[in-house]
């Protein structure tokens, strides 16, 4: 069975999991952030430590490309985490760092875009060519699906509402 390691980074936590190509979850581990915001080295170090621990339990993942979703702006072609305002991450070359450490490619995408991709292929998005996907958590994000494809625009930011903090809005 093919196993794929995935990392989902959020504003309050990150998750490292192992899935099959069909989307079956074989393993999942959630880790809460503990004051790492503003320290990209510590953020990445904690993620790498968890990935290493998961790879010990699931060594078959070492043979396959890995996936990562990030809050904020991504450059999927270059594997760069361009920005995440509330985590204080800017221009972090995660793709090349993972490639060097693990010897396999890392496919990175903005979290809302990744969710919209999932809707296009597995969810309600299969029934329509055009839709707007919204995510509301620690921040508000979005993705546009036009003609059955995720539209990112000239700078890769189309559909992204920016890092709009939602926590303050919920308290009022």
Identify the residue ranges that each predicted region occupies.
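Residue-level recognition of short loop/turn positions
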Residues: 1, 22, 77-78, 147
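Hydrophobic "anchor" residues
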Residues: 24-25, 81, 150-151
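Glycine-rich phosphate-binding loop and adjoining helix at the ATP-binding site
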Residues: 40-48, 52, 64-66, 72-130
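N-terminal phosphate-binding loop and adjacent alpha-helix
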Residues: 25-62
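Glycine/GP-enriched mid-protein hinge/lid loop-to-helix segment characteristic of carbohydrate kinases
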Residues: 3-5, 17-19, 28-30, 37-40, ...
């Amino acid at each position: 069975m093919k196993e794929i390691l995935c990392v989902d980074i959020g504003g309050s936590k990150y998750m490292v999991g192992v899935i099959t190509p069909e989307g079956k979850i074989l393993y999942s581990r959630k880790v809460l952030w503990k004051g790492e915001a503003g320290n990209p080295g510590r953020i990445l170090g904690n993620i790498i430590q968890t990935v290493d621990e998961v790879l010990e339990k699931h060594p078959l993942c070492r043979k396959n490309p890995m996936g990562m979703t990030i809050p904020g702006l991504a450059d999927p072609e270059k594997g760069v985490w361009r920005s995440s305002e509330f985590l204080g991450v800017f221009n972090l070359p995660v793709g090349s760092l993972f490639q060097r450490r693990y010897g396999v490619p890392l496919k990175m995408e903005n979290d809302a875009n990744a969710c919209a991709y999932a809707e296009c292929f597995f969810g309600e998005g299969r029934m329509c060519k055009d839709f707007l996907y919204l995510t509301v958590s620690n921040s508000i994000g979005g993705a546009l699906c036009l003609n059955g494809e995720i539209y990112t625009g000239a700078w890769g930011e189309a559909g992204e509402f920016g890092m709009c903090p939602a926590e303050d809005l919920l308290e009022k």
